A protein has these predicted regions:
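Short, surface-exposed loop/turn segments at secondary-structure boundaries that line and modulate
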Residues: 129, 133-142, 164-185, 282-305
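Glycine-rich, mobile lid/loop segments that gate access to catalytic sites or pores
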Residues: 149-278, 288
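Catalytic cores of large soluble enzymes that bind and process phosphate-bearing ligands
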Residues: 77-80, 98, 102, 140-147, ...
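A glycine- and small/hydrophobic-rich beta-loop-beta segment
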Residues: 298-332
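N-terminal amphipathic/basic leader segments beginning at the initiator methionine
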Residues: 2-105
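Glycine-rich, charged/polar anion/phosphate-binding loops
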Residues: 65-75, 95-96, 219-223, 231, ...
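Residues in well-ordered beta-strands of folded domains
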Residues: 71, 86-88, 111-113, 132, ...
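Glycine-rich phosphate/pyrophosphate-binding loop regions near the starts of catalytic domains
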Residues: 85-150, 158, 167, 243-268
């Protein structure tokens, strides 16, 4: 026989409802984003045999973002028939910011990115991002670090940039050294894909699928904002299955905008919104070695450059970035 809740119990229930309401509202928004009801292309599961989550939403039709090209290939890291290598190529002068795991022993790609984003010149001219799924290259010591360096070197030669201008990310089995030769062998195919298809409509969907591991559906989001009357676009993809926070789980998130924003400002924005999205919930309490969230600004929109953290012109952009990150967080 049910009992009528006490006044204290009613207050607790009301507090929970109030706390959960923003999440419920945001989830509705994420699933009702204009254009999100039509998938860009069929969304296969990350791992054959897994039941697709009942919370799965169609992958949105994401408009091209200026200054970035994306290509995928099957390098053979993932044991199933699926692309497992994703490469982003960015315009010259692209800014980059990153947030990473707080695990005391980060993976080789995490250490690489943290090293080259640090310092006064860090993140000022990032030209590429290379992501592989199936091998985490974590707990691999010097051999793993050397494999990461060789990967960046090969990509830098292809794209005519410095090694430090290539960001890396990996997800998958821990304790196995990355076979960088598999990536090198696919770079010609990747480069052809980058050159052949200028902003294909499904490039973001392919990228989202290419970074999945145990995910049951690809995750993406997009938004638009204004900076002094110029329209700027933001788009992103994420992976993580039962894994949410960059400092407390296993996730990758990559977001690109065509706004022109200094790396220091980009870092401040990413740090601000990570706290209220990716870092606000954990599922299993485990700390991962590979958590990575990277934000890139290509500067191709024509909007004026933002070089100060407190610039009021960032208001619309900051809100749009929060929307994209919240969407990726909620559908993870």
């Amino acid at each position: 026989m049910s009992k009528t809740p006490s006044k204290t119990g009613q207050k607790i229930e009301q507090a929970f409802e109030k706390a959960l309401d923003p999440f419920a509202t945001a989830l509705k928004r994420a699933t009702r984003t204009p254009g999100a009801t039509t998938p860009a292309e069929p969304a296969p599961a990350g791992k054959p045999g897994l039941t697709i989550s009942p919370l799965a939403v169609p992958f949105p039709a994401i408009a091209p973002v200026g200054g970035v090209e994306i290509a995928t290939a099957r390098a053979g890291f993932y044991k199933h028939e699926r692309d497992d290598l994703v490469v982003f190529r960015f315009a010259r002068g692209t800014s980059c910011a990153g947030v990473f795991t707080r695990h005391k022993i980060g993976s080789a790609p995490v250490d690489w990115c943290k090293k080259h984003l640090a310092g006064p010149d860090g993140g000022k001219d990032v030209r590429a991002l290379v992501v592989n799924a199936g091998c985490a290259n974590a707990f691999t010591g010097k051999a793993g670090a050397d494999a990461a360096r060789r990967t960046a070197s090969e990509v830098a030669k292809r794209f005519g940039c410095r090694q430090r201008d290539v960001m890396l990310a990996s997800t998958g089995v821990i304790g196995v050294v990355l076979d960088d030769k598999k990536i090198a062998a696919k770079l010609h195919e990747v480069e052809q894909g980058l050159d052949a298809d200028a902003h294909p409509s499904n490039q973001w969907a392919r990228a989202a699928v290419g970074i999945m591991t145990t995910d049951t559906f690809p995750k993406g989001s997009h938004a638009e904002a204004e900076i002094e009357g110029y329209k700027v676009r933001i788009a992103g993809v994420a992976k993580g299955s039962g894994m949410i926070a960059p400092d407390m789980a296993t996730m990758l998130a990559f977001i690109v905008t065509d706004a022109d924003i200094h790396p220091n400002v980009l870092q401040a924005l990413l740090g601000l919104h990570v706290r209220t999205t990716f870092n606000s919930v954990t599922v299993d309490g485990d700390t991962s070695t590979n958590d990575t969230a990277l934000l890139f600004a290509t500067g191709t929109s024509g909007a004026p450059r933002i070089g100060r953290v407190g610039d009021r012109r960032l208001k619309s952009f900051s809100a749009a970035l929060d929307k994209v990150m919240l969407d990726l967080f909620l559908i993870n």
